[in-house]
Amino acid sequence: MEFRDQVLDLLTEVAETNVIKENPDVELFEEGIIDSFQTVGLLLEIQNKLDIEVSIMDFDRDEWATPNKIVAVLEELR
């Protein structure tokens, strides 16, 4: 499975919605798809499933605003 697909699957699981795969440019926070609790869960899942450690201090809502942006950030970190 491609890295992008892994990230989108993980986001879909955390957000509990398929809109992420249907529209990877959707604004996750503005649209209320992911909240602060889910953000923490997302960072833990990224560490557990993708073996990429992201501190909550490194998390920037603007840089992580859409699924496509999250894929790009994680590509740089891997």
Curated annotation (Swiss-Prot):
InterPro entries: ACP-like_sf, DltC, PP-bd_ACP. Residues 1-78 form the Carrier domain. One of its GO terms (molecular function) is D-alanyl carrier activity. It is found in: Cytoplasm. GO terms for biological process: cell wall organization; lipoteichoic acid biosynthetic process. 4'-phosphopantetheine is transferred from CoA to a specific serine of apo-DCP. Pathway: Cell wall biogenesis; lipoteichoic acid biosynthesis. Keywords: Cell wall biogenesis/degradation, Cytoplasm, Phosphopantetheine, Phosphoprotein. Transmembrane segments: none annotated. It comes from the Bacteria. GO terms for cellular component: cytoplasm. Belongs to the DltC family. Carrier protein involved in the D-alanylation of lipoteichoic acid (LTA). The loading of thioester-linked D-alanine onto DltC is catalyzed by D-alanine--D-alanyl carrier protein ligase DltA. The DltC-carried D-alanyl group is further transferred to cell membrane phosphatidylglycerol (PG) by forming an ester bond, probably catalyzed by DltD. D-alanylation of LTA plays an important role in modulating the properties of the cell wall in Gram-positive bacteria, influencing the net charge of the cell wall. This is D-alanyl carrier protein. It comes from Staphylococcus saprophyticus subsp. saprophyticus (strain ATCC 15305 / DSM 20229 / NCIMB 8711 / NCTC 7292 / S-41).
